[in-house]
C-alpha cells in the first residue's frame, strides 16, 4: 500500500539528502502517512461504506489539507508536492461531502457523479507518493 512505500522510503533519504531537504521530506511524508493511517482506521471496519464513515473520511481529508497547508517548506519541489496534496485532499473532501449529501436525499445520479469525483481525486495519491519518494531519495 501507499503507506508502506512512504515508510520504506524514509530510511533511504535520511542518509542521502541534505539536512534541509531531508527534514522537509520527513514533515511532508509524516502528514501524508498520518492521513493514510486515519483513512485505514475508518475504512477497516465492515461499516466503511456507511454515511458515518464517509463523514469521518471528509474530516480526515479536511484536517490533512490544513496540516499540509501549515507545513513550513522552502524546497520548491516539496512546495509543489504539498500543493498537489492539498488540491487532492480538497477534492476528496468535496467529493465525499457531495456523496454524503446525495446519498441522504437518495439522488442516484448525483451519488454516482460524487463517487466518480472521489475516485478521480484519490487516484492521484499513488503517483504523487511515488514522485515524492523518488525526489526524496534522489542523490543516493
Predicted regions and their residues:
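C-terminal motif of bacterial Sec signal peptides marking the signal peptidase cleavage site
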Residues: 13-16
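Alpha-helical segments in soluble extracytoplasmic regions
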Residues: 24-139
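Bacterial N-terminal signal peptides that target proteins for export
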Residues: 1-6
